[in-house]
């Protein structure tokens, strides 16, 4: 390690260059706060890093980066491909200020047809492929998956209930009554016939849609010829459901079986990359990304960096189509092939259907960026207007809005949504399950106190106070400038008291929003410490903006509450007893009918069930008596 005390900029880089090898590897540049400024890779570390020590020929972005560098770290790799893969991983994990960064890196949802069960179910799946079954996707959004599953339910009558619910059914549920499920749980359909439905669903999702539709059409005609109009109508409805799926897929290529299509457009200092996903010859949707990149970087540089990061934790198809050639395209192709475990082709099509797919993606990229630029301009004006309305020193960069949701105090949750210069920042949303047992059911003050305490205690622990945050004006701040609370003077006072106890009351502006007379929108009253309550003109754009923030917080809190309540509803008391698995639970429910009846049963009655020993019967009996 060279002696680098007191050095920075080109001097520190020169000090490191002297001992660097002529090998491929990855380098990291740090500022005085310990923050990572940049992660780069090189075929030859010594040559690449020495370029930074030269005082001429650098862009303003690189010059700023060099000036702030106070130390560096290096990792030597065996090949340049390894260096590229490591670089992409580190960029996603460390999010360096001067690199091209993906903003929305949420994993893609898939459709899962479960395996290892007599009656496979169809589900939305996100994350590691740990469950046995067949995966289809990726889909661009959860909404696209939901629409597809709904249509497939109507077409193939597959179950969507969890295994635990399936095992405890004693009669068909409502989905069977409305012809959305064939009820394999209660043997309304034989295992053999249900397996046929599953096979048809697999064939459709695997791209054999026409053969499946032909089969259903033939069955419909045969039923009609036999004057079995009831079954003919069922086949007709199933065909309509499949047509509905395909109508939402838009463009479906004839010559492209499996590909991802990337198109980039730059305008107004911003970048949009539109990605379309094609699998089994079907369009599974598209998603627009707005990567953070310096305005001095051209489309080839941004798209190349984006591509390397995009597949860091996602499966790569055999074909990747681009709107233009990227830097180090052959190296990126080799890295993607290594990561995927199969040959990947990366190309810029010049003619034919592939060219049309890229042009379609490019059109969508232009339109999406145009909308984002308009929204960003409008958002900036609204934030400045909010600052003027509420007497803030500057336009807020981060606003947090809190709301609670519960039914008579049960399944209580708190929700926090976040907004900034580019709109809602959904990867910053947080939910809080209310834990305290001391809170009286329905005590909104107590719930808000717990949420605020937990939120800001963790914020201080992880990021320190705003003065201690790493100086990075381009990064989205961790600390809010403003918090909006659903409530009046009492809620604002309670929040100020909590922040005061933590010694941070002067760091955040708290604003309360109380619903107007008769809870009418547009007549809200606003509360701040040291000010009289006030209202805003009904047509004030700032009022509309605050209403949108409040409504989004309300939507998020209610959605979180409903999810928790639904989970609580399907939970069976028998699941809490050690030693009671699906088989014993099914036997108990089949005999007694409900968990409540099981709880009232005597030990002798429990022992009558196959698989329930005396010891297990006493364990069940004691479990309910101890409650």
From Swiss-Prot:
Any one GO cellular component localisation term in the record: excinuclease repair complex
Residue intervals of the UVR domain: 210-245
Domain GIY-YIG: 22-100
InterPro entries assigned: GIY-YIG_endonuc, GIY-YIG_endonuc_sf, GIY-YIG_UvrC_Cho, Hlx-hairpin-Hlx_DNA-bd_motif, RuvA_2-like, UVR_dom, UVR_dom_sf, UvrABC_protein_C
Name the record gives this protein: UvrABC system protein C
Gene from which the chain derives: uvrC
Task of the protein: The UvrABC repair system catalyzes the recognition and processing of DNA lesions. UvrC both incises the 5' and 3' sides of the lesion. The N-terminal half is responsible for the 3' incision and the C-terminal half is responsible for the 5' incision.
Subcellular location: Cytoplasm
MF (Gene Ontology): DNA binding; excinuclease ABC activity
Keyword hit for Cytoplasm: yes
Main location group: cytoplasm
Assembly notes: Interacts with UvrB in an incision complex.
Keywords from the named record: Cytoplasm, DNA damage, DNA excision, DNA repair, Excision nuclease, SOS response
Gene3D superfamilies: 5' to 3' exonuclease, C-terminal subdomain (1.10.150.20), GIY-YIG endonuclease (3.40.1440.10), UVR domain (4.10.860.10), UvrC, RNAse H endonuclease domain (3.30.420.340)
Record-linked SUPFAM superfamilies: C-terminal UvrC-binding domain of UvrB, GIY-YIG endonuclease, RuvA domain 2-like
GO biological process, one term: nucleotide-excision repair
SMART domains xrefs: GIYc, HhH1
Disulfide bond sites: none
Coiled-coil intervals: none
UniProt keyword Cytoplasm present: yes
Family label: Belongs to the UvrC family.
